[in-house]
């Protein structure tokens, strides 16, 4: 009984390198804090996992002027730039989670968000939280599927 179990375990271990080859990690952009322990995007098989993105201006720690609408727009622009590093776009997203520092920003956030997803938007959850990293007003995390936008 022990020999078959050991044989199955050994075969399972041999298949691990094949699984690892399906996962692609992209380094954080130069503007991101390099010391943080996460990847901005991981592709595993045909699934794209995006870490939470903020609306900082590229190459800066600053947020755009203009309130939550502009910060939402910049956040989604940053997501688009990250998606492009793995050959994807907003149309490949299937689910997003939006975190707002103030739920009163919900309507204005939706106005900006809608411009990026005029048809067939991804499934979405929006929640208000007591605080976000780097004093952001919004953070968006998404999951996508490679080639989803081609369908």
Where on the chain are the PLM-derived regions?
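N-terminal presequence-like segments and the immediate start of the first folded domain
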Residues: 2-77, 81-94, 100-151
